[in-house]
């Protein structure tokens, strides 16, 4: 068996994508490496091993992949947070800020019950607009947001600090400077 890789070295960096000056952090290489993916999930769930977490909420789309694995490890339910218009049942909706403008996300109104302990999961946190919207959405229906977990943090963009200012503990596995 080969040794476990340094997780940050498994993430592919694509310069100037999706626009010039951006260094895109592509986690598909990490997801495709069984050892790295397992280690990533293990590290994300470690602080809550043995804790009572009711649900894991994942943000569309890569948050579904990581969040599903985290929910499985914690024996918790999984809740998808999707772009508006993608869920078939009655939903609750929240607007959130994008770099240029805003959008809306939603979840099923009965996906989380008041007082349930929820961990929010996504692949990456940059400016924090989407994660902030997801936290507000979860709180709107009465969830107790225990933490937000991300594989990658881009600390220069301030998203993790934005969530901490909302009283949400943030767990990340790696960080990259720049955009």
From Swiss-Prot:
Enzyme class label: transferase
Chief place where the protein resides: cytoplasm
PROSITE patterns: PUR_PYR_PR_TRANSFER
Pathway: Purine metabolism; AMP biosynthesis via salvage pathway; AMP from adenine: step 1/1
Domain of life assignment: Bacteria
Keywords: Cytoplasm, Glycosyltransferase, Purine salvage, Transferase
Gene Ontology cellular component list: cytoplasm
Catalytic activity: AMP + diphosphate = 5-phospho-alpha-D-ribose 1-diphosphate + adenine
A biological process term (GO) from this entry: adenine salvage
Annotated EC: 2.4.2.7
Annotated compartments: Cytoplasm
GO MF, one annotated term: AMP binding
Subunit: Homodimer.
UniProt family annotation: Belongs to the purine/pyrimidine phosphoribosyltransferase family.
Function: Catalyzes a salvage reaction resulting in the formation of AMP, that is energically less costly than de novo synthesis.
Protein name: Adenine phosphoribosyltransferase
Species whose genome carries this gene: Azorhizobium caulinodans (strain ATCC 43989 / DSM 5975 / JCM 20966 / LMG 6465 / NBRC 14845 / NCIMB 13405 / ORS 571)
């Amino acid at each position: 068996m080969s040794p476990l890789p340094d997780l940050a070295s498994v993430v592919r960096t694509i310069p100037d994508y999706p626009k010039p000056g951006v260094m895109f952090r592509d986690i598909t290489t990490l997801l495709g490496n069984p050892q790295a993916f397992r280690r990533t999930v293990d590290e994300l769930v470690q602080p809550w091993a043995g804790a009572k977490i009711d649900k894991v909420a994942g943000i569309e789309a890569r948050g579904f992949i990581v969040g599903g694995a985290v929910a499985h490890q914690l024996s918790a339910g999984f809740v998808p947070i999707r772009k508006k218009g993608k869920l078939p049942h009655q939903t609750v909706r929240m607007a959130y800020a994008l770099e240029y403008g805003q959008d809306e996300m939603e979840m099923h109104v009965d996906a989380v019950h008041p007082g349930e302990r929820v961990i929010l999961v996504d692949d990456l946190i940059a400016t924090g607009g989407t994660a902030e919207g997801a936290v507000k959405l979860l709180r709107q229906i009465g969830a107790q947001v225990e933490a937000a977990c991300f594989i990658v943090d881009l600390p220069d963009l301030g998203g993790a600090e934005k969530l901490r200012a909302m009283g949400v503990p943030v767990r990340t596995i790696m960080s990259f400077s720049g955009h």
